[in-house]
Amino acid sequence: MVTRLLGRKMGMTQIYNEKGQCFPVTVIEAGPCTVTQVKTKDKDGYAAIQIAFGVRRSKNISRAEMGHIIPKGDLKPEDRKKAFDRQLKETKNAPEILREIPWDGKEDLKVGAKLDVSIFESYKKVDVIGTSKGRGFMGVVRRWGFHGLPATHGQSDRERAPGSLGRQHSISQGVPPGKKMAGHWGVEQVTSRNLDVVQVQKDKNLIFVQGSVPGPTGGLVLVKESTWTAPKPSTVVSKKTKAGQIVKKGH
């Protein structure tokens, strides 16, 4: 069963429910995606499929990737190059992105099969993976929420400075690994988990999810079945309680 689709963030809007309450939703164009490769446990050691989404000019794609997309057929090796060159000239468009997704191997999927947004009609919650917006080079105050140094008592230009970076005369001298410092912010993979599916429009390949989705308008995203579960509160057995009685940690 296929539980993931490539898509594009179209933007945000508002929707009213049956009670007249207004809440924000993100519109995602999920699919249609074309199956470009099928992997099985017998041949490849694991089951997965490769799907393609979007359209871009074939002149902007490498010859090796075009050879992966264009079917080779049952031609002889000496005839494949001529046939490939002919198909390469005839092919004007190519997929914008290729992505391999897990697959249980139970369905009879073949190369060229189409996958649309209808696979999410039975889902109540989904996860959306995207790339966050790039914010450029940021200081520690905006990037990490540092408080900054005092604005008075003799200082002149250290209000937004990070302060000390490490100790000099100690065993762990120098800047410790993972120290929060100024640097590039954004352009990272971000996952929005457990988003409610508000509406699915199969004819337009649109899915409406409640809340925000990472990335700019027009950015590529991956929509998948939500597997997130709320963490359970940690519990410990107190020595003062009776045997078998569980109390919450910190109580």
Labelled PLM ranges:
Residues 1-251:
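Extended basic (Lys/Arg/His-rich) segments that typically form rRNA-contacting surfaces
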